Amino acid sequence: MVHFCGLLTLHREPVPLKSISVSVNIYEFVAGVSATLNYENEEKVPLEAFFVFPMDEDSAVYSFEALVDGKKIVAELQDKMKARTNYEKAISQGHQAFLLEGDSSSRDVFSCNVGNLQPGSKAAVTLKYVQELPLEADGALRFVLPAVLNPRYQFSGSSKDSCLNVKTPIVPVEDLPYTLSMVATIDSQHGIEKVQSNCPLSPTEYLGEDKTSAQVSLAAGHKFDRDVELLIYYNEVHTPSVVLEMGMPNMKPGHLMGDPSAMVSFYPNIPEDQPSNTCGEFIFLMDRSGSMQSPMSSQDTSQLRIQAAKETLILLLKSLPIGCYFNIYGFGSSYEACFPESVKYTQQTMEEALGRVKLMQADLGGTEILAPLQNIYRGPSIPGHPLQLFVFTDGEVTDTFSVIKEVRINRQKHRCFSFGIGEGTSTSLIKGIARASGGTSEFITGKDRMQSKALRTLKRSLQPVVEDVSLSWHLPPGLSAKMLSPEQTVIFRGQRLISYAQLTGRMPAAETTGEVCLKYTLQGKTFEDKVTFPLQPKPDVNLTIHRLAAKSLLQTKDMGLRETPASDKKDALNLSLESGVISSFTAFIAINKELNKPVQGPLAHRDVPRPILLGASAPLKIKCQSGFRKALHSDRPPSASQPRGELMCYKAKTFQMDDYSLCGLISHKDQHSPGFGENHLVQLIYHQNANGSWDLNEDLAKILGMSLEEIMAAQPAELVDSSGWATILAVIWLHSNGKDLKCEWELLERKAVAWMRAHAGSTMPSVVKAAITFLKSSVDPAIFAF
C-alpha cells in the first residue's frame, strides 16, 4: 500500500503566512541561522495555521520564540507528547499557543503550529539553529537554506505520525503566497576570496579592507524552485584548528552544557601517490522512480536525471578495476538486479551491464529503497572483496529512519556512498546512510554533474584503507577530554574530520596550552597530525559549539520514535532537554496566557501551502487536466492485498498517473534506447574495453573525425597490435577534448595507460610521439609516464 503526500486546494481563504526572513551568520565553517515566519490573520475568525518546511538534517535547532503584537513569548523545550498535550490544552482554554516539532520519521522536516491567532493580529515566529558547513572538492564551504520540500513516497508500515501524512496544500511556485528574504554575513580570519550562489544575489559587500568580513543578500523574488545555496571560498581552509567554548555559568560542572566544549577539525594529509585497490565488490543502486524523468536543474532542461544516471553508470562501469566484482540494481516501487548476484568484472559482464544501462528508464513508480537494500545485505559476501555500495536517489522517502537503521545494522559488511539528486532531496536519508556505514555523501543540484561527483567518490572508495585511527589529547594534570563524537574509523584523502569533546576537571591558569593528535596507519606506515591550542575557553551567548556537540551525540542515539532502542530513547530525551537542541522526542512550545479568549467552536484551520516542482512528485507522471488549483485526492488507495509488482495506480481529481512498467532494468514498454546525442566523450568512453584498451574500428574513427583507412595507414610499423594504436589515440583525444571533465575519466584513463605499458613496452615513447603528431595535438607525452 502506498500513500502520496500533497493536496492542491480549492479553498480561497487568505494564507496567514506572509513572509519568511532569514539572517545567516557564518564564522569559519559554522553557520548560525535565525529564521522568522511572519503571520497575519486577515480573516474575521481566530485561526490555527500549520506549516511544514524542510531543514538540513545537521541543523541543531535550539531556540523558538514568538512576537505577538509586540509581546515576546519564549518557548520551552519539552517532551514531545507533553508539549502536544499542553498545546491542545492552551488552545482549549483560549490561550494563544505555538508548537515547533521535527517529523517523527525524518530529521529534515519540521512543522510549526500557530494556534488561536486573533482576527487582525500579527505574529512573528523565530527559530534559531546552528550547523557545520561541509567542504566541497574545490575547497568551497557549502551553506544550503532548504526551500524545497518534495512530496515523500511512503511505503507500507510508514509512520502514521509523520507530518508528511498531513495533506498540506501544494501550489505551483509562481502562485506561492509568501516571500523569502535572506541576508548572510560571513567572517573568516583567513580572508574571503569570493561568494557564489545558485540564486541571484546582491554584489558581495566587503566590510573591511582585509576582506575578512563580507555580506550578501538574496535578490528579491525567490520562487522556491530550488534551495538557496552559498559557496564560500576562503583564502585558506585546510588549517587544522581547535575551538574551545565556555559552558553555561549557572550549570554545574560535569554536565555537557556546564563544562567547556571543544570542536576539533583536521585535514589529514594522506599521500596521493598510494596505489589503488584492485579488489572489491561494487554495487550501484540507482533510483528509477518517476521523478528521475525530471531535469537535473530547474534552470536547465538539457539533461534529465535518468540520462545523467545512465552516463554516470557507464563511467563507473568503465572505471572499475580488473578483478573486482559488481552488480547494478534499479529500484522504484519494485526492484531488480542486473545479475542474480555480483559477478566478476570481465569484458562479457561489462558489455551485458552496458546493454541494460542503455535501456534503463525512469519507469518504476515510487521510491521504495528499503527492499533492495535488504536484498543486497542478504547476499553472500565475497572473500577478499569488501562491499562498496553506491546509492543514487532523489531521496523522496518518508520513513528515513527505517532505511538508516537497516544500513547501520549492516555497517560491518560494507561502506555506503550516497548521492542526493536534485532539489529537495532528503538530507536526512542521504547523510544518514553514509554516516551509518562510514561512507561519504554528495548532493547534486543546479549545474552540478552527477558524473563528476560519482567518479570522485569511486576514486575515494579505491583508496587504500586507513587503519588504526585514533585521536589523543595531551592536557595539563586534572583536566581530561571526554569524546562526544562517534569514534572515527574511516579517513579519505581530501576529507575534513570534525570531532567534539567535553573538557572535564579543573581548567588551568591562563597561557596554558593543550594538544590534540590524530594518528593513523596507511599501508604499514604511521602518520600523525597535531594541533596545539590555548586552554582559554571563549564565551558564546548562543553556545554554538555545545549545541553542535549535542547534535553530534544525538545523531548517534536518536533514530526516531519507532526505531530508537529504549535504552537510547531515555538518553536522547535527557540530552535534548539539557542542551536545548530539539530531537525526535522533544518539541518547542510557547504559550501566551495573557490572551484569554475562549474559542467558540473549533478554530478555523489553515494549512500553509508549499511549492510543488513539476517532476518532483515521486511516482507521478503528471497530466494537468483542469489546472493546478483543484484538489488532489485519491478516490481510493490501492488495496493492501494488491500483489507486489502490479500497477499501483489510481485516478485523481487533478492528476492522472500513467502506466508504468514495473519490470526490471529493461523496460518492456519502451525497448528503444534514447541516444547519447553528439556527446563524443561519452561515446568514446562507451567503446572502451574492460581491460582499458580500445579497438581500432569505425566507431573510434568517427569519434576522432577521420577515416579508418587514414588511422590504419598512420600506425607505426613497430606497433603490431592495432588496439595499442587505438588506445594511445583515444587517450590523447581525451586529454585534448575532455580536459575540463578529467575527474570523470581519470580512472578509466589510468587503466588504458597501464594496459599500454604492458603491451607497447620499449616502443611506447616513439608510438606516443607519432600519435601526437598524427592528431596534431599539443598533449604532453608525460601523461603516459614512460
UniProtKB/Swiss-Prot annotation:
The keyword Magnesium does not apply. PROSITE patterns: VIT (PS51468), VWFA (PS50234). It comes from the Eukaryota. Expressed at low level in many tissues. Not expressed in 80% of tumor cell lines tested. Residues 1-131 form the VIT domain. InterPro entries: VIT (IPR013694), VWF_A (IPR002035), vWFA_dom_sf (IPR036465). Keywords: Tumor suppressor. GO terms for cellular component: nucleoplasm. It holds the Pfam family VIT. Residues 281-462 form the VWFA domain. Disulfide bonds: none annotated. May play a role in tumorigenesis as a tumor suppressor. Altered expression of this protein and disruption of the molecular pathway it is involved in, may contribute directly to or modify tumorigenesis. This is von Willebrand factor A domain-containing protein 5A. The gene is VWA5A.
